[in-house]
Amino acid sequence: MLNKIVIVGRMTKDAQIYEKEDNKIATFCVATERNYKDDNNEISTDYLLCKAFGKTATNIEKYTSQGTLVGITGQMRSRKYEKEGQTHFVTELYVETIKFMSPKNKNNETPSDNQFENNTYQPDDLEIIHI
């Protein structure tokens, strides 16, 4: 089985950054367009919740803001939680790689590849299968 997602889209707002057990985590939403128009002749948009960890989260914090065009590869994950007696389901894109494709950061610069910090953190529940 394969769980590999590739998207290109724009960040809908600045990433939310927090730390858990000494690891930085970034959560953000990316808007992507579908390749067809709806009944009103308008292009439909999907909004994907994304989550990144470690150095990738640090780079997202440094080099992105609302409107940044990004290319992402990763895995879709679903989870559920209880809140006030109701079960909620969430589907998230766990970021493996991200490419910043437009200069939307505070300095209006796009970082070069050698400016990125290497990411070595993997979340505990991320299963890596080597073929």
Curated annotation (Swiss-Prot):
- Biased-composition ranges, Polar residues, are 104-122
| GO CC annotations, alphabetized | nucleoid
One GO MF term on file is: single-stranded DNA binding
Transmembrane stretches, start-end: none
Task: Spell out the InterPro entries in the cross-references.
Answer: NA-bd_OB-fold, Primosome_PriB/ssb, ssDNA-bd
Residues of the region (Disordered) are: 104-123
Q: Its gene?
A: ssb
The name this protein carries in UniProt is: Single-stranded DNA-binding protein
Q: Which residues form the SSB domain?
A: 1-102
Q: Which HAMAP family match?
A: SSB
Q: Tell me the Pfam families matching this sequence.
A: SSB (PF00436)
Q: Which organism is it from?
A: Staphylococcus epidermidis (strain ATCC 12228 / FDA PCI 1200)
Example of a GO biological process term: DNA replication
Query: Subunit info?
Result: Homotetramer.
Origin superkingdom = Bacteria
Q: Which UniProt keywords apply?
A: DNA-binding
